[in-house]
Amino acid sequence: MIVSSSLFIGLMSGTSLDGVDGVLVDFSQEKPNIARVASSKFAPDFIEHLTALQKPGNNELHRAALAANALARVYAQVVHALLAGSGVSAREIRAIGAHG
């Protein structure tokens, strides 16, 4: 039996290049309930890598792909923190939305 969950995770890394913020929200009631928040700061070398992508250079596509993979790992860290801190399992999450 598949149970429809009302738990969602939102992730965002903004233009400030400082890190990723995440939220676990329960939409089961009339008013959404923020169940947990978590964030992770970017390492200084990752910030330098992202900043360098704003200028023309060698291997831009390769460097952008490496940055995307590193960003995905930070997203995963924040999701893990949200789940661990709330006692919610990954199977209980209906969807994850990410922007950044």
Language-model features and meaning:
Residues 1-100:
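Short acidic/glycine-rich loops and adjacent helix/strand connectors
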